[in-house]
Every structure is written in structure tokens, then in C-alpha cells.
Swiss-Prot record:
Organism: African swine fever virus (strain Badajoz 1971 Vero-adapted)
Described purpose of this protein according to its UniProt entry: Plays a role in virus cell tropism, and may be required for efficient virus replication in macrophages.
Protein family according to the UniProt entry: Belongs to the asfivirus MGF 360 family.
The organism's taxonomic lineage, starting at the top: Viruses, Varidnaviria, Bamfordvirae, Nucleocytoviricota, Pokkesviricetes
Protein name: Protein MGF 360-1L
GO biological process: taxis
Listed InterPro entries: ASFV_MGF360
Outcome of gene disruption: No effect on virulence.
Domain of life, source organism: Viruses
Alphabetic keyword roster: Early protein
Induction: Expressed in the early phase of the viral replicative cycle.
UniProt-listed Pfam families: ASFV_360
Amino acid sequence: MPSTLQALTKKVLATQPVFKDDYCILERCGLWWHEAPITIHHTCIDKQILIKTASFKHGLTLNVALMKAVQENNHGLIELFTEWGADISFGLVTVNMECTQDLCQKLGARKALSENKILEIFYNVQYVKTSSNIILCHELLSDNPLFLNNAQLKLRIFGELDTLSINFTLDNISFNEMLTRYWYSMAILYKLTEAIQYFYQRYSHFKDWRLICGVAYNNVFDLHEIYNKEKTNIDIDEMMQLACMYDCNYTTIYYCCMLGADINRAMITSVMNFCEGNLFLCIDLGADAFEESMEIASQTNNWILINILLFKNYSPDSSLLSIKTTDPEKINALLDEEKYKSKNMLIYEESLFHIYGVNI
């Protein structure tokens, strides 16, 4: 909560509609950054405060805005963001002048950050899904010694990227590059168009990485764009295998299938990764590798998958196979995760209802 009446007044003022005639008032009040007014907005889900300016039009969290203000040694904004609720400890991540460090400590920051606090800061800043936030986090943190030397963070990022590193070895790249790839992947996961373009333009040699993340994170729009824009060294069956490692990746599985990927291999991969939803989609798309899939399910004693594979009354879904499109708009409308229900899953569930008398 704001600690002074003045800070509260500024907070109320920053939430109001901004007109050009009011710019001089906002500038005098300190609600001015990078030659533009500061406004306050809130995230839809958890109502976090977002700071917006012309430079950060999609919004920054208070803590990320504070880190940027500290980097710029903007003492007025450091005090304002702290009064609005930012954690002054975050400022120690980007502090570069003794006078600014003194101000941070005066406002309550410790002299140094512990390894656990550094990890906490990383977890805190990464989850707000705006292009401005992702881009600035990359710029402030990817080459930051505090994060490059954090052993726990290295393990976390290594684990996040390990499954996706199908065409390179993580041991052969720097941690700075790992962090860059991580922020790039977050932009694709959250479907942040401006952030994706930012990374694409600056890291053109990561074109395969963009495609990999598009497949893995079910972003069929970005997958389609990059697949048709760039030559890739990744085989279509490799793409399908990656798509099948994450359940409910319906749009990218369908896209790879339409490009000619082996749907039986996709079925087997789905079983290997315990992806029930993907398994049913593969059956809808004509997969019939039941013997191989049953052998894998039996080895792991996965009775849910075993029972699904024992059922005999499956057939391809002609409504999916007849369309034959790689248009992401059409694919998304056809296989929207919240609306799509597999024809063969419905048949299987109906059979269970007849056996047990309850909906599964």
C-alpha cells in the first residue's frame, strides 16, 4: 500500500484516462518516464499492478519497473514504485551506482541478495505474460552476474530446456544463451507476438529454436509462420515426436500430420509420454499402432492406457481427415483445447458408462 498521501494521490491519478492536455501535470507530479506519461493498469487474473508507458506499452510489473528505474538511477521513480508496493530488494539486481545502492538500503533493502532471494526474484518476474515484461526481463537478467552465478537457477533452467534441446547439447552452450533461449520460449508459450518478433530479429540464428518451441507449446500460429518463412533442419517426424511429448497439443499434432508426419509413431510417442488426450487424437487421425503401444503401456503397468488400447471399437474421424488444412486459423477452430472432444474418446467413455453406470 502507498505509504504517503502524496503517493496515494499519484496512484489514483495514474489510473485515470490520460489526455495530452494533462501531460504537463503528470510530468510535474513525477508520473513521467522516457518522455511519456506513466499509467497504472491491472492484470485480468490476479489484479497485479502493471506500469505502462509509451516505451512499455504492454505493461511491466511493479518489481520489473523498479529494476529498470534502478538501472537508470531514477531516484524519483525508485521511491514512487516502492511506495506503490514494489519490493526494494529487486532493485539490488540492477544497481550500478553507490548513491542508488544507498537509496535502496535506505528504503529497506539489504546490503546483498542471498542465492535463495535471487531465485525468488527470478520466479516472481517470469510469470507476468506481457511482451514488455518478457523483453525487459531478458535484457536485465540474461547477462546479469547475480543470475549467471546462481547454481540453483542453472539447474532449474537446464531442466526447463532439456526436453526441448533436440538439435543441440545444453552442455555445449553458455548459461547466458540458456537464459536467452528460456525467455524466447516464454514469449512463444504465452503467444506474445511483439516479444517473439523481438527475439526473432535479434537472434536470427535461433530460428530452429522458435520452431521447436512453437511445436512443443502448441502455438500453431507461430509454428506456421516460422515453418513457411525459414528453412529448417528439423525433420517433420522429429517435430511430431516433440508435439506428442506434451498432452493436449492437438493443433500442432494435427499440423504435423497434415505435413506428412507418421501418425503411428505419434501414437507410440503419446503412449510413451502417458499423454491420453494426444493418444485419442492420433486414433482420430487414423493411427492403428495398437500392438506396439500396448507393449509400451504394459511395460509401465499403466492400466489407464492399457484399457484404452484394449478397446476395439475405434475408427478414424472423417470430419478431421477430410479438411486437410495447414491454415492455423482453421486448425485452431477445429481443435481448440477448451472445445475439442475426441470422437473416439467419447466412444470409449460411453462404453465405460455402459459397463460401470457412471460418467468417467
